[in-house]
Structures are given as structure tokens and as C-alpha cells.
Regions:
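C-terminal ends and interior cores of transmembrane alpha-helices
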Residues: 37-51, 239-252
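A single, central transmembrane helix in multi-pass transporters
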Residues: 119-126, 163-218
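Helix-loop junctions on the cytosolic side of multi-pass membrane transporters
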Residues: 128, 132-153, 331-338
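Juxtamembrane intracellular "pre-TM" segments in multi-pass secondary transporters
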Residues: 141-176
Length: 338
């Protein structure tokens, strides 16, 4: 199982930036459609060939599909809003999308249980195939604004697209800030462990994790309001989030779940605003590529969370929150208008 997860992770890392380039040079909408088809293919492989070769092949195509969505999704939404003069609404739209991604896990988990009882593994597999294909069909309906030629940002190859992220004024620091900030989201993998350590009964651990997820959804949904706060607010909220995370971990009581929940809500509010600030800085012709560069950084930064947890648990991860705050302050501040 670990080998399969590693294969999935490596595939996503290797495909992250190239798929962003593909979306920029071909079609962001097309990339989303292709992602849905590939993810459906992954479920087909897992359903008809549930052995090691089938699962390995499925994880490869699933990893490529996930990478296709990573940069293309945000780029398509931002440029679509910009085309109608509504780019200022992106943070609210992105926050609502992030919140929905968390909330939809609840009914899908319940439905999966019903499907398993009704038809077992195969029924769940084919239902997943149908869902992915339906998502691909829906993606064909997304509006994609026509490409506008930009004299100083021509259609660029991979190397020049990446160098854009590294050299454009104000963009490199934003990419770094979002990469490190996004990597902190790996803490969600440990919420069940934290709940057990806080004394939550084993049977109630899923409910405790659900509380944290709901708080995260609320934070993401309120990101639009957080975006209007003073410049110091984002790093301040991140520091507060880290403090609550540490306090919740050190307080060995089930009520500490509330502290972790508020921590996660604050964190996701900051993350959504940060990702929106990055989009404000990225030139349109390479938007998906640069977003994918940040996504690659997020995957790398998540390793810091895993390492910190191994060294000192949640309090050590909280230190990463504190270390990230200055990066957020520097990389995600709004440019001064003169």
C-alpha cells in the first residue's frame, strides 16, 4: 500500500508543472475535461483489475489527472472572472470552492457506505467512474475566455515559464509564501491522531474530525472578509492558528478539539486569501504553469510537516506555522498603489 501511495505521489510531482504548461499552451478547460476522463480511467482499472498492476496503473493515471486540475482549475476561474471585470470576486469564489470540497466529503462518505452495502466494491467503483465522467462532461460547459496576445509574455516553453515565476518582481516571494503555506495543510492527515490523543473515544473520532473539517469550511467561506483586513492580519491569523493548534495538542481533553477546529478554520482563511493574492500577481498567459509551480512547492513543503510531526508532534508543526508567518507577511502583502 505504501508503495502505491508513493507511486501516486511521485507521479503527481513529476506531472505537476508539465500539466500546467499543457493547460497554458492548449486549453485550461480541456485540461479539466481530460483530468476527469483520466480519473475515470483510474477507477476503471481499480474496478476491473483489482490487483497490484491494476492499482499501480490506476494511481499513475489518477496522479496525472490530479496534476491537470492543480494549475488549470484556478487559472480558468480567475481568467474567466477577469474577462468580465470581476477578478475582485475571485477570493470569495475560491473560498466557496474550497469550502464545498470539504463539505461534499460528508454526503459522499455516507453514499459510499450505502453503495457498499447494496453492491459491494464493484458498484462503488462503477459509480465513481460515472461521477468522474459526469465531472468531465460538466467541465466542457465551463466558459473559457479567448487568449489575448501579450507582447511581453509570449507562449513560452517550460524553462521560460518556470523562470517567469522566479524572476518577475513580487511573484517569486508570493510563490514561495503560497508553497510553504499550502504545505501546512498536511496537518489534516493527523487530525484523527490528535483526536485520540485528546481523549476522544475511538468511535467518536470521525465525528471529531468532521467538526474540524466543518470549521475549515467555514474559514474558507469567510476568506473574502479576511482579504479585506489590514496587511498585518494574515500573518497574525496564522500565528493565532499555530498557537491554537499547539494549545489543542497540549491540552489532553476532548474539548481541545474545538481549539484545533478554530485553528484549522483560521488557517484555511489565510490559505485561500494567499492563493488569491498569488493569482493577482501571475501574468495570464502562464497562469496555470506558475500555479503548478506553487503546487509543486506545496507538495515539497508538506514534507516539512511530516518531519516536524515525527520530531515533536503538533507543537512542532505549530512552530512551522510561526516560521511561515514572516513569509506570508512579505510575499502576500498587497502592492502599494502610487
Amino acid at each position: 500500500v505504501s508503495a502505491l501511495f508513493a507511486l501516486w505521489s511521485v507521479t503527481g510531482l513529476l506531472a505537476e508543472v508539465p500539466t500546467g504548461v499543457l493547460a497554458d499552451r492548449w486549453s485550461r478547460r480541456g485540461a479539466l475535461v481530460l483530468a476527469g476522463v483520466l480519473e475515470a480511467a483510474g477507477f476503471v482499472l481499480w474496478t476491473v483489475a483489482p490487483g497490484l498492476p491494476g492499482f499501480a496503473a490506476g494511481f499513475v493515471v489518477w496522479g496525472i489527472g490530479g496534476a491537470l486540475v492543480s494549475g488549470a482549475g484556478e487559472a480558468l476561474v480567475y481568467d474567466g472572472l477577469a474577462a468580465v471585470g470581476a477578478e475582485g470576486s475571485y477570493v470569495r469564489v475560491h473560498g466557496a470552492t474550497t469550502a464545498t470540497e470539504l463539505l461534499v466529503q460528508v454526503p459522499t462518505a455516507l453514499l459510499a457506505g450505502v453503495l457498499v452495502g447494496a453492491g459491494g466494491y464493484e458498484l462503488v467503483g462503477w459509480a465513481s467512474v460515472a461521477t468522474c465522467l459526469a465531472a468531465a462532461a460538466l467541465a466542457t460547459r465551463f466558459p473559457e475566455p479567448p487568449r489575448t496576445g501579450d507582447d511581453d509574455e509570449p507562449d513560452v516553453p517550460l524553462r521560460r515559464a518556470v523562470s517567469t515565476a522566479l524572476r518577475r518582481p513580487g511573484l517569486r516571494s508570493a510563490v514561495v509564501a503560497v508553497a510553504v503555506l499550502g504545505g501546512l495543510d498536511a496537518i489534516e492527515e493527523y487530525f484523527p491522531v490528535m483526536a485520540r490523543e485528546q481523549g476522544v473515544a475511538t468511535g467518536l473520532v470521525p465525528a471529531a474530525v468532521l467538526v474540524v473539517a466543518l470549521a475549515g469550511a467555514a474559514g474558507a467561506a469567510l476568506a473574502g472578509r479576511a482579504a479585506g483586513l489590514p496587511a498585518r492580519a494574515l500573518p497574525g491569523l496564522l500565528l493565532l492558528s499555530g498557537g491554537l493548534l499547539a494549545a489543542g495538542a497540549l491540552w489532553g481533553h476532548p474539548a481541545a478539539v474545538a481549539a484545533v477546529a478554530v485553528s484549522y478554520g483560521l488557517y484555511l482563511a489565510v490559505l485561500v486569501v494567499g492563493e488569491a493574492r498569488l493569482q493577482e500577481r501571475v501574468p495570464g498567459p502562464v497562469r496555470a504553469t506558475v500555479t503548478s509551480v506553487a503546487g509543486l512547492g506545496i507538495e515539497a513543503a508538506s514534507l516539512l510537516v511530516f518531519g516536524a510531526w515525527a520530531l515533536g508532534g503538533a507543537p512542532a508543526v505549530a512552530v512551522l506555522f510561526a516560521v511561515t508567518a514572516p513569509l506570508v507577511a512579505r510575499g502576500l502583502r498587497r502592492p502599494v498603489v502610487t
